[in-house]
Amino acid sequence: MAYIHRTLEQKIIDISRDYSCLLLIGPRQVGKTTMLEHLMEGSGRQKVTLDDVENRRLAQSDPALFLEMHPAPVLIDEVQYAPQLFSYIKINVDNGAAPGSYWLTGSQAFQLMELAQESLAGRTAIVHMSALSQSELYGDGTTEPLSLKLEKLNRRKEHLSSCNSMEMFERIWNGGMPGHRSGRYTDRDVFYSSYIQTYINRDVSDMIPGVDKLLFADFIRAAACRVGQMLNTHDIAQDVGVSDDTAKRWLQVLEKSEVIFYLRPYSNNLLKRTVKTPKMYFFDTGLAAYLTKYSNPEILMNGAINGAILENYTVAEIRKTWLNSAKECLLHYYRDKDTNEIDMVIEADGELHPLEIKKSTNPGTELASAFKVLDKGSVPRGAGAILCLREEISAIDRNTFILPIWMI
């Protein structure tokens, strides 16, 4: 099994020089612990996991003793199982713990962020990690957040590998989970089947004691069928046979464990006719393709959700470019009551950058016409792009590019 280097590695090293405590959060099995273990080789840092029942029991019942038995520098894995540790780590940090003393990982992002902000506010750096990016799998892993400045786009090409339409859907179908993509688990279907079972049996069961596991599995599949769509909780609830309130709670669980994420609609005081409903995406398109039972990339490319899952892949990859730089990402979509719609809007450096995503190798220039609606707002519109299956970069004008999705 080959280790796949992660873009976040240097960020982790840099942050650990400044902060005594680092909290690395992200979905289950995206490689958080593997990356940190790689970085700590030969450093003398020890690792302790709260997956171990005895370690968990001690951390919960006597957190002070636990930290004495596992002195810094230490990696504490799955820290969400012992929230009692946070206030004791705070004491150690306040007493002068050295930079890089505590590396913490966990897969329940919302709970962990809340704990860190309550107990370790200003004392810990919080970093998000997702599945492997295009840059990590098919490039050199060094790309910055997506920028639509021409010089940066030209430089970006040097770090990534181009692909045709079929190869793009192979990327989408295979997903970005390190366990599968590193070669450790070669059978994709077996890997994702095991992933879902572990996720429900451990994470979901912890968050919803007594949950009907088979029904929840059906619920995840129903959600996967709706990637790239405006969220309709009632429709998902009806498909599965649960109440709307139950569906809302279960969607919260999927979001808190980062299986799904949302794009919120962009709005400001001058754009008052915009909709309020978010769009839903899966963090990993391989998981979504598995749940929707597409047995190979070719069938997926010609299937009913081909455009939606391509959009999901594109949005998730853009999001990763920001997460992998440890920078805040202000990503939205636009839709108003006059049916004007823009698939994605990036808010960066005081400008709005509109993006349209299309399953086409030769998209029409009229697709960029909706971008002008943003001119009615108070934030200036910057460069935009049509993201598509074209293999080479092109442009409509100096402010609107036609960009291959492989360049993200």
Question: Where are the regions that the model predicts?
Answer:
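A short beta-strand-to-loop transition that corresponds to the Sensor-1 phosphate-sensing loop
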Residues: 105-109, 115, 123, 130-132, ...
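Conserved P-loop NTPase "ATPase switch" module shared by AAA+ and STAND
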Residues: 69-85
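Interdomain hinge/linker elements that couple catalytic modules in large macromolecular machines
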Residues: 135, 139-316
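Catalytic P-loop NTPase motifs of RecA-like helicase/translocase cores
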Residues: 54-56, 81-83, 111-112
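Short glycine-rich substrate-engagement loop in P-loop NTPases that contacts/grips substrate
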Residues: 45-73
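Short regulatory helix/loop adjacent to the ATP-binding pocket of P-loop NTPases
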Residues: 110-126, 138-143
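Conserved catalytic/switch belt of AAA+ P-loop NTPases
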Residues: 86-104, 108-110, 117-119
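A cross-kingdom feature that marks ATP-driven nucleic-acid transaction machinery
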Residues: 1-27, 33-46, 50, 70, ...
